[in-house]
A protein has these predicted regions:
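Beta-loop-alpha module in the N-terminal Rossmann-like domain of NAD(P)-dependent dehydrogenases
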Residues: 70-131
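N-terminal Rossmann-like dinucleotide-binding module
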Residues: 1-70
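Short, Asp-centered acidic motifs that coordinate Mg2+ and/or phosphate
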Residues: 54, 89-90, 168
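Contiguous beta-strand/loop segments that form the cofactor/metal-binding neighborhood of enzyme cores
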Residues: 2-12, 186-261, 300-303
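Hydrophobic residues in well-ordered beta-strands that form the structural core
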Residues: 116-117, 141-143, 254
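C-terminal helical cap and adjacent loop that interface with cofactors, partners, or active-site loops
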Residues: 2-4, 270-303
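A contiguous active-site-proximal alpha/beta segment in oxidoreductase catalytic domains
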Residues: 98, 121-181
Length: 303
């Protein structure tokens, strides 16, 4: 028993040292301090211990308030001050969509890594120019389409690579009314990005808008076809995001990016479903799920 305790303590020590050694080599800056940033992005940076040196905003009256909340950060209205600081290795940007292209261009031109809230620009020409600038400077640039990096999505991506034939899927993204912005660019872009990430480039086979709140889509990929319901005609108190994928091996179900399950299909003989003749026991395997009982990193929504 003493030997087992020593092994456990040794493991805990190694794990703790590994975490403490993961230090950042540079400083970072954040442009913008709106509601989305303070509610969603700053908490993640704090959780990851990202060393922010600057917070940049356009309102001088906010500067002393920002430094009161973030005592180790310099608040400024000058983007030039941020971009000319050699300590700054990367910049997070989350401001008005109209200002994204201008700020992103300047960040890339100064060869700083860029993480920018969607959309990074407002038209195809601006997007082309940003892509060219990123290629010229060879710096890391990323748009905030973070759902594709969720653990459940990563697992699902690997599982789908082992399936054969044409896959079919149904996706529902249902929220309440969204009068404060563009639902397509602010909300619906996330599920659309997810299916492109999972199945590759998509061809729009059918688009059916319903009033100004719902879009029904049929998308065709190289080896998959899916139906999407994207709507702001439901409720925020019970907003839903779910996907069901039918493959040759079985059925994958993804709920709220928090639960991923797999149900194997019953066998067939010469096209005949044996479950109609023999007893079939449905077995659902949980491939990913959060356990709120244990306060571990994997069970934290920030993770």
């Amino acid at each position: 028993m003493e030997h087992i305790k020593n092994v456990i303590e040794r493991y805990k020590h190694v794990r703790n040292m590994k975490m403490l050694q993961q230090a950042y080599q540079g400083k970072y800056a954040f442009v913008g301090i709106g509601n989305h940033s303070t509610n969603n992005l700053y908490p993640v940076l704090n959780y990851l211990h990202v060393p922010l040196k600057y917070i940049c905003c356009k309102t001088p009256g906010k500067l002393h308030l920002i430094e009161g909340v973030f005592p180790h950060v310099r608040a400024t209205t000058s983007l030039d001050e941020v971009l000319t600081d050699e300590d700054i290795k990367g910049v997070f940007v989350s401001v008005s969509s109209k200002a994204h292209f201008s700020i992103a261009s300047r960040v890339l031109a100064h060869k700083k890594a860029l993480f920018i809230e969607k959309p990074p620009c407002l038209n195809a020409e601006e997007l082309r120019r940003l892509i060219e600038l990123q290629k010229q400077t060879q710096v890391l640039a990323m748009v905030d389409l973070q759902k594709r990096f969720a653990p459940a999505m990563q697992i699902l991506k690997k599982k789908l690579q082992g399936s054969k034939g044409t896959k079919t899927y149904n996706l529902k993204f249902l929220t309440g009314a969204y009068p404060e912005g563009d639902a397509l660019l602010d909300l619906f872009i996330h599920p659309i990005d997810c299916v492109v990430y999972l199945f590759g480039k998509a061809e729009v086979r059918c688009v059916e808008p319903i009033d100004e709140h719902t879009v029904m889509l049929v998308l065709k990929h190289a080896d998959a076809i899916g139906v999407l319901e994207l709507s702001t005609d439901y409720t925020w108190s019970d907003a839903k995001e779910s996907m069901t994928i039918n493959t040759n091996k079985g059925i994958y179900s993804l709920e709220q990016m928090e639960t991923l399950t797999f149900q194997r299909k019953p066998h067939r003989f010469c096209g005949l479903p044996l479950e109609k003749v023999l007893m079939h026991v449905n077995v659902t395997a949980e491939l990913f799920g959060r356990n709120n009982f244990q306060p571990l990193m994997q069970n934290n929504q920030v993770f």
